Amino acid sequence: MPDSGHVMLTVLLHHDQSKTLDEIMAHLKKTGFYRDFPPEGSELVSWVVAMSFGFVINLEVEADKVRSVNRYMEQKAWGAFRYEVFPSYDFAPIAADLKKQHA
């Protein structure tokens, strides 16, 4: 991340398996989850599907907008997903350096 005023967040969205996919999609449409994504003050870094789990999303977030990301998830994702968030960072450059050091 080029700017120290930003943090990376990894968001885990686990599908609510008590609901059908149609029910989940209807809820997300009603709340505007996809329409309004990503939350204000954040930029999408990656979004992958973890099969039988849900989504793993990485966001670069302005440090003073972390609360707004949390509120976004509470207002738009709850009811369709269980939600967890973790501060994170890109380990790939470190792993590449370690690979060279351990060669």
Regions found by a protein language model. Give the residues of each.
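Short S/T/G/P-rich N-terminal loop/turn motif that feeds into the first structured element of a domain
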Residues: 1-54, 61-67, 71, 89-103
